[in-house]
């Protein structure tokens, strides 16, 4: 690709980016709807920098899934922004806070390209700006109409600071480049406030199911396409609530795997939170991420068993039934093989959460001398990991990924307010490369 192959908007953004990198006076955010060539422009910028002898180029994404997509499409290895900034979980009483425990060495970083910047919250953005060296130029790429971030402990979503901060020059792409025109046309209208509608060209596009048998027809269509484990990777069902996601996963797993078991050997599952290992170097605790939030792992061994949980100062023990899974890295990520414990039953999860709530309440009102032993709370809580089956995910978890066919379950979207519902639907429609089905 040459400069002449770019759209006028891409050319303008490219020139602004190159000028910003040269002058080092401000950063740049490239904002654009789906199909306007943000990824193409990103790759072109990277290639131009490398071809002119540029060094210190780092690619970052806010999630593991987005990192994988960015690496594949740009042709250069990307990392999660949390790993680049060395952000790890810190516990305070019963809360987990993600903080920067050590300052990373970014002295060699000249250009930091951040993808999917609509997902960056204020705290992460603040850490980013305070960490980069003064000679580093940040190039943010995203779509300000996608799902907005919410600070931990808050209920109100807000637009990412990448689109509002005074130090970021705003470039907007408007000309559609992507070839899947029906999906882009519908996505553009959804982005502007409309609801989904059908549009199919040459057998591909957006199709909905309505009427009394809509859900049944939607699932029949899904199973006409998805028939095995291999088919799950490029076909994703999306819903708003975890309850809907779990129900859809249950239906799909029962059909595909012909089992009522929660987990089976050989199945690919998705981590719903990072798995850390903590060890000491020179007497100092160091945390290492084994599996990232959103990373795929394969089940090698699966056993349903039970264990007792207890905590100092809290009367009694609680018997918790759970799965012991041995899992391994799936795909081309660094290989690990680990044992994890999963509570899959709602009844057992309720019992475990009751124990945690009782422990937290006891420790908040600790009157037995000394500090409350919060380490017991976290030792118990960290015993268990959270995972989900591969077929279905929330819209939030799907943001940043791309699949051949997207299946959108909309009934539970109506629990969201109008603005969020529009963002959810927009993210759902733009996940599919060739087809989008909705009910």
Curated annotation (Swiss-Prot):
Pfam families to which the protein is assigned, alphabetical: AAA_30 (PF13604), SH3_14 (PF18343)
GO biological process, one term: DNA replication
Disulfide bonds: none
EC identifiers of the protein: 5.6.2.3
Known role: DNA helicase that stimulates viral DNA replication and recombination. Plays a role in T4 DNA replication initiation by selecting and activating DNA origins. Acts by dissociating and reassociating with the DNA molecule being unwound. Unwinds DNA as a monomer in a 5'-3' direction at a rate of 250 bp/s and can efficiently displace proteins from the DNA.
PANTHER family, A to Z: ATP-DEPENDENT DNA HELICASE, ATP-DEPENDENT DNA HELICASE PIF1
Protein name as annotated: ATP-dependent DNA helicase dda
